[in-house]
Amino acid sequence: MGQKIQPHGLRLGITSDWRSRWYADKQYADYLAEDIKIREFLSEGLERAGIANVVIERTHDRVRVDIHTARPGIVIGRRGSEADRIRGKLEKLTGKQVQLNILEVKNVDANAQLVAQSIAEQLVNRVAFRRAMRKAIQGAMRQPQVKGIKVVCSGRLGGAEMGRTERYHEGRVPLHTLRAEIDYGTHEAHTTFGRIGVKVWIYKGDVVGGRRESLMNARDERPSRGGRRERPRRGGARRQRAEKKQEG
């Protein structure tokens, strides 16, 4: 199960948070399609900016878009011209006032999405896929918070006639452990031989404290189904009389 499912979706509410934060009843499908268009517009228009994540929050008359990027200067532009252009496009797309927040990703080598984008860019530039994968693994493992990394590339690797899948990993990546903080990212490299898919999993240790700790404490307080409960001892009155005689 943990090997197949998307790691963020499996751990929602445990170690990861929602990337679309709003509630809707009848307009749910419209808002969802709108979020997809917003993310597609940002990923296609700001491909060189290294966008790691896009978080969207909605109120009744405003849309807040948080862009986590490795190169905030490209998103902002000269004197904020690029940010104003993006805000105008998003307001035209949503029909509401847009609050645009640009946040810098400090540690690029520990972000799975940025690592996947870096590998894909190297594949487009005709770098050997094994060299690109090993370089990404070495850069990630040098970070103190990274406990393990797994990289998968699929497609016509090296221009081969038949597509195949290559996997490299180092350290631990426990995909079945729900308390494990797993960062996941994907990207596609459009080469002259066709598309090559890149997937990256980065393990940053177990989450201790917060909501997860409270859930564990609540579970420990409940009696287990198969556990034996302590039963009251029989013959209590007779035993008490015998104990009183011994004391007397």
From Swiss-Prot:
Assigned keywords, A-Z: Ribonucleoprotein, Ribosomal protein, RNA-binding, rRNA-binding
Chain positions covered by the region annotation Disordered: 214-248
InterPro entries: KH_dom, KH_dom-like_a/b, KH_dom_type_2, KH_sf_prok-type, Ribosomal_S3_C_sf, Ribosomal_uS3_bac-typ, Ribosomal_uS3_C, Ribosomal_uS3_CS
Entries under SUPFAM superfamilies matching the protein: Prokaryotic type KH domain (KH-domain type II), Ribosomal protein S3 C-terminal domain
GO biological process, one term: translation
Compositionally biased spans, kind Basic and acidic residues: 214-229
Domain KH type-2, chain residue ranges per copy: 38-106
A molecular-function term among this protein's GO annotations: structural constituent of ribosome
GO annotations of cellular component type: cytosolic small ribosomal subunit
Tree of life domain: Bacteria
Comp. bias intervals (Basic residues): 230-242
Matches recorded under SMART domains: KH
Transmembrane segments annotated in the record for this chain: none
Protein task: Binds the lower part of the 30S subunit head. Binds mRNA in the 70S ribosome, positioning it for translation.
The family this protein is said to belong to: Belongs to the universal ribosomal protein uS3 family.
Subunit structure: Part of the 30S ribosomal subunit. Forms a tight complex with proteins S10 and S14.
PANTHER family listed in its UniProt record: 30S/40S RIBOSOMAL PROTEIN S3, SMALL RIBOSOMAL SUBUNIT PROTEIN US3C
The protein, known as: Small ribosomal subunit protein uS3
Top-level taxonomy: Bacteria, Bacillati, Actinomycetota, Actinomycetes, Mycobacteriales
